[in-house]
Design a protein with these regions (language model features):
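Soluble catalytic domains of membrane acyltransferases
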Residues: 1-144, 148-149, 157-162
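C-terminal amphipathic helix plus adjacent low-complexity
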Residues: 160-170
């Protein structure tokens, strides 16, 4: 089991390409998406494709719930679009890091790069709790990855980097 970071998340194509990459690699993807995506006729389709709706305004126990479910699986990849949106932002969402830390599983970096028309998997990061050091590794990997729409890329940075190490739950 792993947390698969899908970045840079810059277009609607990212979703389909990342799912295809996960399936081709023999992983069973479970991906997190905003709950609005699951409204109406798309709900059963997105659920069948491994979707898990997220209320971004009230995430509550999402990290603990996903971590508990993920810890029991072996070929499962929890796919997280770390930027949380296709638009350029200031920070990545920290859920991918917190899920991996809580479930005691590695973070696998994956990418799509529009300028080179390539995609694939990068290094595996084992979260140490030193968020800044771990994010330095992640930033180094994504430095030359532009996404399908490079102008929408968000630099990998978490608000948590300024704080103390992230504690692990008991």
């Amino acid at each position: 089991m792993c947390v698969l970071v899908a970045a840079p998340h810059t277009s609607n194509w990212d979703f389909f390409l990342m799912l295809a990459m996960a399936w081709e690699s023999g992983l069973t993807p479970r991906w997190l998406g905003k709950r609005e995506m699951f409204a109406g006729p798309m709900r059963p389709i997105f659920r069948a494709l491994g979707g898990v709706p997220v209320d971004r305004e009230n995430p509550g126990s999402l990290v603990a719930d996903v971590a508990a479910h993920a810890g029991a699986a072996t070929a499962l990849a929890v796919v997280v679009p770390a930027e949380g949106t296709r638009a350029k932002g200031e920070y990545w969402k920290s859920g991918f890091y917190r899920i991996a830390r809580e479930a005691k599983v590695p973070i696998v970096l994956s990418y799509l790069d529009g300028p080179t028309r390539t995609g694939g998997f990068g290094p595996t990061v084992h979260p140490s709790g030193d968020v800044k050091a771990d994010m330095d590794l992640i930033r180094a990997f994504y430095a030359d990855k532009g996404g399908v729409k490079p102008e929408n890329k968000t630099t990998p940075r978490l608000r948590d980097e300024e704080g103390p190490p992230v504690p692990m739950s008991a």
